[in-house]
Amino acid sequence: IPLIVYDPEQVDIDIKGYKDLWDPSLEDSIALTANYRVINGITQLSMGESMNEEDVDVIKKTGEKLLELAPNVRLIQDDNTQNALLNGEASVAFLYTSQVTAALAENPDLKVVYPEEGLGFGIMGMFIPSEAPDKDAAYSFMDYIMQPEVAAKCTDYIGYYSTNKAADELVNPDLVVPDDVTKGEIVQNVSQDADAQYQKNWTEFKAACD
């Protein structure tokens, strides 16, 4: 779950959602993860649209809105994006939860925002190849990793949420999604035409940020 994180000592506004990222006061101060569907998606959520919109004309409007964000973007990178926030290069960052965890470990005064427009979810799965030499061992590992105590330790360590609800009670409370966060979407596959437009939006956006 990507979230907004910012340094309240460096930001003059109270960030509540994605739409606030377009505020002129944030010029050249935002670090973004490098995921074209996610960044298109948060733009759509800021516009009241679905992250999985497939109407190409609507997606083109998303691209226009995204270009308006470019002046506020300091950098775009996927790995260790939190470092830009920690070293002062950026004052606001849009981070994966693992990066949020790393950032808070270094600076607990950072403010984490669960955007009011809703969250975008991605799911990482475990899969067993059809020709796996020891499927029983693989199933045993999956059973182990999903035990509440083990799943909670994984969440505390890396920051990714567990699909085992029973683990929530054992996780660091700061890493549990607040009860009042009720809106969200899973990023899903879209049509080839829609995906092509999302990628076009992304290419044009990155060029505008350079």
Model regions: which residues?
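Short, hydrophobic alpha-helical packing/hinge segments within bilobed ligand-binding/sensory domains
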Residues: 18, 81-84, 100, 138, ...
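A ligand-binding cleft/hinge motif common to bilobed small-molecule-binding domains
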Residues: 92-110
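Periplasmic-binding protein-like
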Residues: 59-68, 106-130
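Extracytoplasmic ligand-binding site segments that recognize negatively charged/polar headgroups
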Residues: 1-89
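Short secondary-structure boundary segments
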Residues: 8, 34, 97-98, 157-158
